[in-house]
């Protein structure tokens, strides 16, 4: 009887330890899906983001706090609609985690966008900004902005100063994404 109790106790402890680190994370989600044919992934240095010529010193220092961007996009088509729904649900579950604080949410022309961050409340700085955008006809994109002591308010101000954000401004990036894999 003591042997069974010991085995059961050890099994429970091992199960508890195994489950502690098993919660899904964005990093793990990226790694698990970057080679899937339905996804496109990019790792971009912050140097690819440009500010307007008359950008403020504050916007320039905010951009300097950003190190890189990880982009993972699910490209939806008729053949993968079921997987699209499944993957969208997975991403939403991950970013619902309490460690992510919502910064802004908006809907426009059938697109949903959520911006969240993870960081320190003590000094109002963040180390990861997450942008999730969904378009029911095209798929979704997940962007992780990684940096050191980024400030959410300053990032929002800087976004207003980012140069040419029209269709032509992203044409090169769109062409690159089409040819990836």
Language model: regions and residue ranges:
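Bacterial signal peptide processing site
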Residues: 21-24
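Early exported N-terminus immediately downstream of N-terminal targeting peptides
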Residues: 27-93
């Amino acid at each position: 009887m003591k042997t069974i109790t010991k085995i059961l106790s050890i099994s429970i402890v091992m199960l508890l330890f195994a489950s502690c680190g098993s919660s899904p994370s964005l990093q793990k989600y990226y790694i698990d899906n970057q080679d899937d044919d339905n996804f496109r992934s990019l790792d971009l240095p912050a140097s690819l983001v440009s500010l307007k010529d008359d950008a403020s010193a504050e916007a320039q220092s905010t951009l300097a706090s950003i190190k890189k961007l990880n982009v993972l996009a699910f490209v939806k088509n008729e053949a993968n609609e079921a997987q699209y729904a499944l993957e969208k649900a997975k991403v939403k579950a991950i970013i619902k985690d309490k460690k992510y604080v919502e910064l802004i949410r908006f809907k426009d022309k059938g697109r949903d966008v959520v911006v969240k961050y993870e960081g320190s409340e003590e000094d109002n700085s963040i180390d990861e900004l997450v942008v999730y955008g969904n378009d029911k006809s095209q798929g979704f994109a997940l962007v992780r902005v990684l940096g050191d002591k980024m400030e959410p308010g300053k990032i929002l101000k800087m976004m207003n100063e980012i140069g040419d954000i029209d269709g032509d401004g992203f044409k090169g990036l769109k062409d690159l994404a089409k040819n990836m894999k």
